[in-house]
Protein backbone atom coordinates (compact mmCIF):
# COMPACT_ATOMS: atom_id res chain seq x y z
CA UNK A 1 0.00 0.00 0.00
CA UNK A 2 1.38 3.39 -0.97
CA UNK A 3 2.20 5.71 1.93
CA UNK A 4 0.33 8.92 1.00
CA UNK A 5 2.46 11.06 3.31
CA UNK A 6 5.69 9.84 1.72
CA UNK A 7 4.22 10.34 -1.73
CA UNK A 8 3.29 13.94 -0.96
CA UNK A 9 6.72 14.66 0.49
CA UNK A 10 8.37 13.12 -2.57
CA UNK A 11 6.24 15.20 -4.89
CA UNK A 12 7.10 18.34 -2.94
CA UNK A 13 10.81 17.59 -3.12
CA UNK A 14 10.59 16.93 -6.85
CA UNK A 15 8.77 20.23 -7.36
CA UNK A 16 11.37 22.06 -5.28
CA UNK A 17 14.26 20.51 -7.19
CA UNK A 18 12.63 21.35 -10.52
CA UNK A 19 12.09 24.90 -9.33
CA UNK A 20 15.71 25.20 -8.28
CA UNK A 21 16.73 23.87 -11.69
CA UNK A 22 14.65 26.53 -13.39
CA UNK A 23 16.24 29.22 -11.24
CA UNK A 24 19.69 27.87 -12.10
CA UNK A 25 18.89 27.91 -15.81
CA UNK A 26 17.63 31.49 -15.49
CA UNK A 27 20.78 32.50 -13.64
CA UNK A 28 22.86 30.89 -16.39
CA UNK A 29 21.27 33.16 -19.01
CA UNK A 30 24.24 35.51 -18.94
CA UNK A 31 25.96 38.08 -21.11
CA UNK A 32 26.19 35.93 -24.24
CA UNK A 33 22.45 35.32 -24.24
CA UNK A 34 21.74 38.97 -23.42
CA UNK A 35 23.86 40.22 -26.32
CA UNK A 36 22.30 37.79 -28.78
CA UNK A 37 18.76 38.60 -27.62
CA UNK A 38 19.51 42.33 -27.95
CA UNK A 39 21.12 41.85 -31.35
CA UNK A 40 23.78 44.41 -30.45
CA UNK A 41 27.22 44.24 -28.83
CA UNK A 42 27.76 47.43 -26.82
CA UNK A 43 31.42 48.46 -27.07
CA UNK A 44 32.86 51.20 -24.88
CA UNK A 45 35.47 53.38 -26.57
CA UNK A 46 37.26 56.60 -25.72
CA UNK A 47 37.57 57.22 -29.46
CA UNK A 48 40.90 58.98 -29.05
CA UNK A 49 43.58 56.32 -29.42
CA UNK A 50 45.18 55.91 -32.82
CA UNK A 51 45.69 53.29 -34.13
CA UNK A 52 43.58 51.19 -31.74
CA UNK A 53 40.16 52.88 -31.60
CA UNK A 54 39.46 56.42 -32.69
CA UNK A 55 36.45 58.36 -33.90
CA UNK A 56 37.00 59.78 -37.37
CA UNK A 57 35.36 63.20 -37.12
CA UNK A 58 35.02 63.46 -40.89
CA UNK A 59 33.11 60.20 -41.34
CA UNK A 60 31.61 59.91 -37.86
CA UNK A 61 32.81 56.29 -37.71
CA UNK A 62 35.18 54.48 -35.37
CA UNK A 63 38.38 53.13 -36.89
CA UNK A 64 41.39 51.12 -35.79
CA UNK A 65 42.73 47.72 -34.78
CA UNK A 66 40.35 47.24 -31.85
CA UNK A 67 37.40 48.42 -33.93
CA UNK A 68 38.05 45.70 -36.50
CA UNK A 69 38.37 43.05 -33.79
CA UNK A 70 35.20 44.21 -32.03
CA UNK A 71 33.31 43.92 -35.33
CA UNK A 72 34.56 40.35 -35.75
CA UNK A 73 33.58 39.49 -32.17
CA UNK A 74 30.08 40.77 -32.88
CA UNK A 75 29.91 38.74 -36.09
CA UNK A 76 30.84 35.59 -34.18
CA UNK A 77 27.77 36.19 -32.00
CA UNK A 78 25.52 37.03 -34.94
CA UNK A 79 24.99 40.63 -33.81
CA UNK A 80 26.01 44.19 -34.74
CA UNK A 81 28.22 46.67 -32.88
CA UNK A 82 27.04 49.84 -31.20
CA UNK A 83 29.71 52.12 -29.72
CA UNK A 84 29.23 53.76 -26.35
CA UNK A 85 31.43 56.82 -25.70
CA UNK A 86 33.49 56.79 -22.52
CA UNK A 87 36.64 58.55 -21.24
CA UNK A 88 39.82 57.31 -19.63
CA UNK A 89 38.76 59.04 -16.42
CA UNK A 90 35.35 57.31 -16.33
CA UNK A 91 36.31 54.01 -17.99
CA UNK A 92 36.36 51.97 -14.79
CA UNK A 93 33.11 53.39 -13.42
CA UNK A 94 31.34 52.98 -16.77
CA UNK A 95 32.53 49.37 -17.09
CA UNK A 96 31.47 48.46 -13.57
CA UNK A 97 28.09 50.16 -14.09
CA UNK A 98 27.41 47.94 -17.10
CA UNK A 99 27.12 50.76 -19.63
CA UNK A 100 28.62 48.45 -22.26
CA UNK A 101 29.42 44.76 -22.72
CA UNK A 102 33.13 45.30 -23.34
CA UNK A 103 35.55 48.20 -23.45
CA UNK A 104 37.97 47.88 -26.34
CA UNK A 105 40.03 50.95 -27.17
CA UNK A 106 43.67 50.19 -26.42
CA UNK A 107 43.08 49.35 -22.75
CA UNK A 108 46.26 48.38 -20.91
CA UNK A 109 46.14 45.27 -18.72
CA UNK A 110 46.96 46.27 -15.13
CA UNK A 111 46.66 44.61 -11.73
CA UNK A 112 44.45 47.48 -10.56
CA UNK A 113 41.95 46.90 -13.36
CA UNK A 114 41.99 43.13 -12.95
CA UNK A 115 41.23 43.46 -9.24
CA UNK A 116 37.99 45.33 -9.93
CA UNK A 117 37.00 44.11 -13.39
CA UNK A 118 37.64 41.23 -15.78
CA UNK A 119 40.28 41.52 -18.49
CA UNK A 120 40.84 39.16 -21.38
CA UNK A 121 44.14 37.49 -22.09
CA UNK A 122 46.66 40.01 -23.37
CA UNK A 123 47.26 40.84 -27.02
CA UNK A 124 49.88 43.00 -28.76
CA UNK A 125 53.06 43.88 -26.88
CA UNK A 126 53.81 47.58 -26.37
CA UNK A 127 55.30 49.94 -23.81
CA UNK A 128 55.25 53.47 -22.45
CA UNK A 129 57.34 55.91 -24.43
CA UNK A 130 57.42 59.58 -25.41
CA UNK A 131 56.45 61.81 -28.28
CA UNK A 132 58.36 65.08 -28.75
CA UNK A 133 59.27 67.59 -31.44
CA UNK A 134 61.78 66.27 -33.93
CA UNK A 135 64.08 69.22 -33.15
CA UNK A 136 64.20 68.13 -29.48
CA UNK A 137 64.71 64.41 -30.05
CA UNK A 138 68.35 64.40 -28.90
CA UNK A 139 67.41 66.09 -25.60
CA UNK A 140 65.38 63.13 -24.40
CA UNK A 141 67.37 59.91 -24.27
CA UNK A 142 66.29 58.58 -20.87
CA UNK A 143 63.66 58.86 -18.17
CA UNK A 144 66.01 61.12 -16.21
CA UNK A 145 65.96 63.66 -19.05
CA UNK A 146 62.19 64.01 -18.55
CA UNK A 147 62.19 64.27 -14.77
CA UNK A 148 63.02 67.96 -14.60
CA UNK A 149 60.93 71.01 -13.77
CA UNK A 150 61.96 72.59 -17.05
CA UNK A 151 60.33 69.76 -19.02
CA UNK A 152 56.60 70.18 -19.69
CA UNK A 153 55.06 66.72 -19.87
CA UNK A 154 51.50 66.47 -21.19
CA UNK A 155 49.10 63.57 -20.55
CA UNK A 156 45.40 62.79 -20.77
CA UNK A 157 43.54 62.47 -17.44
CA UNK A 158 42.68 59.25 -15.64
CA UNK A 159 44.61 56.68 -17.65
CA UNK A 160 47.91 54.85 -17.38
CA UNK A 161 49.80 57.72 -19.07
CA UNK A 162 48.96 60.06 -16.19
CA UNK A 163 49.71 57.34 -13.63
CA UNK A 164 53.11 56.72 -15.20
CA UNK A 165 53.99 60.42 -15.11
CA UNK A 166 52.87 60.83 -11.49
CA UNK A 167 54.82 57.76 -10.37
CA UNK A 168 57.99 58.16 -12.39
CA UNK A 169 58.36 61.86 -13.20
CA UNK A 170 57.61 63.71 -9.94
CA UNK A 171 59.90 66.62 -10.82
CA UNK A 172 58.54 67.42 -14.28
CA UNK A 173 55.98 70.12 -14.99
CA UNK A 174 52.91 67.98 -15.56
CA UNK A 175 50.17 69.31 -17.85
CA UNK A 176 46.86 67.46 -18.13
CA UNK A 177 44.86 67.89 -21.34
CA UNK A 178 41.36 66.39 -21.57
CA UNK A 179 41.57 65.12 -25.16
CA UNK A 180 44.29 62.55 -25.78
CA UNK A 181 43.99 62.80 -29.56
CA UNK A 182 44.79 66.54 -29.46
CA UNK A 183 48.06 66.22 -27.53
CA UNK A 184 50.40 65.31 -30.44
CA UNK A 185 49.48 68.52 -32.28
CA UNK A 186 50.01 70.53 -29.08
CA UNK A 187 53.48 69.00 -28.74
CA UNK A 188 54.28 69.86 -32.36
CA UNK A 189 53.09 73.44 -31.76
CA UNK A 190 55.31 73.85 -28.69
CA UNK A 191 52.51 73.97 -26.10
CA UNK A 192 54.34 71.20 -24.21
CA UNK A 193 57.65 69.39 -24.63
CA UNK A 194 56.78 65.72 -24.26
CA UNK A 195 53.73 63.49 -24.43
CA UNK A 196 53.67 60.29 -22.42
CA UNK A 197 52.13 57.73 -24.73
CA UNK A 198 52.57 54.16 -25.92
CA UNK A 199 54.68 52.72 -28.70
CA UNK A 200 51.65 51.91 -30.87
CA UNK A 201 50.36 55.47 -30.72
CA UNK A 202 53.77 57.14 -31.00
CA UNK A 203 54.65 55.20 -34.13
CA UNK A 204 51.41 56.28 -35.79
CA UNK A 205 51.78 59.99 -34.95
CA UNK A 206 55.41 60.13 -36.09
CA UNK A 207 54.32 58.60 -39.37
CA UNK A 208 51.51 61.14 -39.78
CA UNK A 209 53.30 64.33 -38.64
CA UNK A 210 56.84 65.13 -39.79
CA UNK A 211 57.26 67.61 -36.91
CA UNK A 212 57.22 64.82 -34.32
CA UNK A 213 59.70 62.20 -33.12
CA UNK A 214 59.69 59.21 -30.77
CA UNK A 215 63.37 58.85 -29.83
CA UNK A 216 62.80 56.04 -27.30
CA UNK A 217 60.46 53.97 -29.45
CA UNK A 218 62.77 50.94 -29.49
CA UNK A 219 63.54 51.16 -25.78
CA UNK A 220 60.20 51.77 -24.00
CA UNK A 221 59.99 52.40 -20.26
CA UNK A 222 57.59 49.48 -19.72
CA UNK A 223 56.28 46.36 -21.43
CA UNK A 224 52.55 45.74 -21.48
CA UNK A 225 49.69 44.05 -23.27
CA UNK A 226 46.26 45.32 -24.22
CA UNK A 227 43.18 43.54 -22.94
CA UNK A 228 39.42 43.58 -23.46
CA UNK A 229 37.74 45.02 -20.37
CA UNK A 230 34.50 43.67 -18.87
CA UNK A 231 32.53 43.90 -15.65
CA UNK A 232 33.05 41.03 -13.22
CA UNK A 233 30.39 38.39 -12.70
CA UNK A 234 30.13 36.34 -15.90
CA UNK A 235 32.86 33.75 -16.33
CA UNK A 236 31.21 32.31 -19.46
CA UNK A 237 31.45 35.72 -21.17
CA UNK A 238 35.11 36.08 -20.23
CA UNK A 239 35.79 32.53 -21.46
CA UNK A 240 34.06 33.26 -24.76
CA UNK A 241 36.02 36.47 -25.36
CA UNK A 242 39.30 34.70 -24.55
CA UNK A 243 38.40 31.80 -26.87
CA UNK A 244 37.54 34.24 -29.66
CA UNK A 245 40.85 36.11 -29.30
CA UNK A 246 42.84 32.86 -29.25
CA UNK A 247 41.13 31.73 -32.46
CA UNK A 248 41.81 35.06 -34.19
CA UNK A 249 45.43 34.90 -33.10
CA UNK A 250 45.79 31.34 -34.36
CA UNK A 251 44.17 31.97 -37.76
CA UNK A 252 46.40 34.98 -38.46
CA UNK A 253 43.70 37.66 -38.24
CA UNK A 254 45.46 39.63 -35.49
CA UNK A 255 48.74 39.56 -37.43
CA UNK A 256 47.02 40.93 -40.54
CA UNK A 257 45.39 43.74 -38.56
CA UNK A 258 48.71 44.57 -36.90
CA UNK A 259 50.31 44.89 -40.34
CA UNK A 260 47.43 47.10 -41.47
CA UNK A 261 47.18 49.47 -38.52
CA UNK A 262 50.41 49.36 -36.54
CA UNK A 263 53.54 48.31 -38.42
How should these model regions be labeled?
Residues 40-45, 63, 143-158, 174:
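Short loop->beta-strand "edge-of-pocket" segments that line small-molecule binding or catalytic clefts
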Residues 125-132, 199, 203-246, 263:
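Periplasmic-binding protein-like
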Residues 67, 82-93, 138, 157, ...:
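Short helix-initiation/N-cap motifs at beta->coil->alpha
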Residues 29-106:
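Extracytoplasmic small-molecule ligand-binding "clamshell" domains
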